[in-house]
Amino acid sequence: MKDQRLLDSVPLPNDPDRSLRPQVLDDFIGQEAARANLKIFIEAAKARQEALDHVLFVGPPGLGKTTLSQIMAKELGVNFRSTSGPVIAKSGDLAALLTNLEERDVLFIDEIHRLNPAIEEILYPAMEDYQLDLILGEGPAARSVKIDLAKFTLVAATTRLGLLTTPLRDRFGIPIRLNFYTIEELEYIVQRNARLFSVQISDDGAHEIARRARGTPRIAGRLLRRVCDFALVKRAKKIDRKVADEALSRLEVDHLGLDPLDRRYLLLIAETFLGGPVGIETIAAALSEPRDAIEDIIEPYLLQQGFIQRTARGRILREKAWNHLGLCAPASTISTQKCAQLLNTQDNSSGQTTLWDEADE
């Protein structure tokens, strides 16, 4: 996005919240199923004295994918190397990373769905056979070279599982989906961060921040910092519900965690397109925002909260969105939603889906 939003779940440069990240699995709050499974896999790998199988984290930004990757390396007692898909532009970039890894090291690739397809082809034998196949030279003088690699663990993160190719997905032995946090979990995180900041906060103050944090710890930490700024200037001795509510209201973050851009998104569909359906490209053009930003940052929370519905024909506002905006839904919109729900029910009646079956609509 062109302007940094307060409620962006992407990390900011020099973000002070980086220093608040937990260092061990037992200190990590939330994602209980993921933590429990990771603990078992890590203990098993250590007992066998082998590299942990490759891990793929799937979920919206800000839920702890990078933090969990760092914790995994520490729990395994190995080195941690980090990069991202768009940064690996040439085969030489990937070769330099892989050849510098030691036995059982963890290599973390964020946004792996943005990896160049040519680079992805080189990654396949590296993940499966721990070998690097490179072509040296050009034309008739070109020759293939195989380089043996240390047995490493690739930990990848993506917000868009549907953009990963099937061969790449199949090479990850441990797929883990991270979900939005509950308000109770976020309250605990806010209180913990406040203690680390040496700031006094009441239970209702922590609750007020947590319920507006969009289910995302990174956003909760950012909101806490801004509320601390207000409390300091207002000379409040303690952050209670009144202080938190006043600060967040002035920042235009409402009680459900929606900011002006979220409301623009909902109002656009409601007023311009009468509740939808409307295509994502049309929404992106009308909001002057990249499609990826809308799909990765704005829509996941709106979908999770039941404000919108994705259909084959486009996005549709649901009843909760109309109520939140204080608007009346057109009668045609209600019948369209019922039809879309019926179609979705029929589509899903054939069987259950797994993590690998999911794709972005």
Curated annotation (Swiss-Prot):
Keywords: ATP-binding, Cytoplasm, DNA damage, DNA recombination, DNA repair, DNA-binding, Hydrolase, Nucleotide-binding. GO terms for biological process: DNA recombination; DNA repair. GO terms for molecular function: ATP binding; ATP hydrolysis activity; four-way junction DNA binding; four-way junction helicase activity. Mg(2+) binds at residue 66. Residues 182-252 are annotated as: Small ATPAse domain (RuvB-S). The keyword Hydrolase applies. It catalyses: ATP + H2O = ADP + phosphate + H(+). DNA binds at residues 291, 310, 315. The keyword Repeat does not apply. It is found in: Cytoplasm. Pfam families: AAA_lid_4, RuvB_C, RuvB_N. Has 3 domains, the large (RuvB-L) and small ATPase (RuvB-S) domains and the C-terminal head (RuvB-H) domain. The head domain binds DNA, while the ATPase domains jointly bind ATP, ADP or are empty depending on the state of the subunit in the translocation cycle. During a single DNA translocation step the structure of each domain remains the same, but their relative positions change. Homohexamer. Forms an RuvA(8)-RuvB(12)-Holliday junction (HJ) complex. HJ DNA is sandwiched between 2 RuvA tetramers; dsDNA enters through RuvA and exits via RuvB. An RuvB hexamer assembles on each DNA strand where it exits the tetramer. Each RuvB hexamer is contacted by two RuvA subunits (via domain III) on 2 adjacent RuvB subunits; this complex drives branch migration. In the full resolvosome a probable DNA-RuvA(4)-RuvB(12)-RuvC(2) complex forms which resolves the HJ. HAMAP family: DNA_HJ_migration_RuvB. This is Holliday junction branch migration complex subunit RuvB.
